[in-house]
Design a protein with these regions (language model features):
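Mid-length scaffold segments of soluble, non-membrane domains
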Residues: 78-138
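Bacterial N-terminal signal peptides that target proteins for export
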Residues: 1-6
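Post-signal/leader-peptide non-cytosolic segments of secretory proteins
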Residues: 27-30, 51-56, 63, 170-177, ...
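Hydrophobic/aromatic-rich core segments of domains that either
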Residues: 127-190
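Low-complexity, Gly/Ser/Thr/Pro-rich intrinsically disordered linker/tail segments
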Residues: 191-209
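Hydrophobic h-region of N-terminal signal peptides that target proteins for export
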Residues: 10-18
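Acidic/histidine-rich, surface-exposed loop or edge segments in extracytoplasmic proteins
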Residues: 40-73, 96-108
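Short N-terminal segments immediately surrounding and downstream of signal-peptide cleavage
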Residues: 20-43
Length: 209
């Protein structure tokens, strides 16, 4: 089954009354750290919790970068794993550990996130990595949206920009279940409608080559 994403509030119009674009913007602008960050869930970031990571959990994230990546490709692989690990740790305390990849399969289930939730949280996880000096080859980018009902359902994801080449890579944590590595691939390939095969395991980060 192909998993398409559009925010829960597009599936359920009554949720529009609870979705606040200004809130999402504020969440995306926060300077997240392991000691303090806001986590959103419920579809369209209708629920927000102020959280902090346990030191032991953050130590596991930092351990992924204990050997300094040799290049941007290797760093993207570490980023993908770090996003999955952060999702796992946060899921244990927020009740989102059962989040199913995609929107439709888990729609209406407790703890399910849509792509607005995922892209917002992933952006803030990326800021944590940056703020702790773990990103040497990338900057945290803006969220990007594809689809707009013209060539597919709207879908939003986080991004990073490679410092050397200035190439933008999507960091998409929505396709797979909670705790799985994020998909990282070039912006244009993602905008062209890339999606994983429904039966395939999570892919390693893809480069421009």
């Amino acid at each position: 089954m192909i998993r398409w994403c559009f925010s829960f509030f597009l599936l359920a119009p009554w949720m529009l009354a609870h979705a606040d674009p200004d809130l999402v913007t504020r969440l995306l602008r926060q300077d997240a750290t392991p000691a303090h960050f806001d986590f959103c869930h419920g579809g369209g970031c209708v629920a927000v919790e102020a959280l902090s990571l346990r030191e032991a959990d953050w130590d596991e994230v930092e351990a992924l970068f204990s050997h300094v990546p040799d290049d941007a490709d290797e760093e993207r692989a570490r980023i993908a794993d770090a996003i999955g690990l952060l999702e796992f740790f946060v899921g244990r305390v927020t009740g989102t550990s059962n989040d199913v990849g995609g929107t439709f399969e888990g729609f209406g289930m407790p703890g399910q996130l849509d792509c607005i939730d995922e892209s917002t949280n992933t952006t803030n996880y990326l800021k944590m990595l940056r703020n702790r000096g773990l990103l040497r080859f990338h900057e945290v980018g803006d969220t990007h949206t594809r689809g707009y009902f013209l060539n597919g359902w709207p879908h939003t994801a986080a991004s990073v920009r490679e410092m050397g080449s200035k190439a933008v890579y999507i960091v998409d944590s929505w396709f797979y279940d909670n705790g799985e590595p994020a998909v990282i691939l070039p912006l244009q390939r993602w905008q062209d409608g890339w999606k994983p095969d429904a039966s395939a395991p999570a892919l390693p980060p893809l480069s421009e080559d």
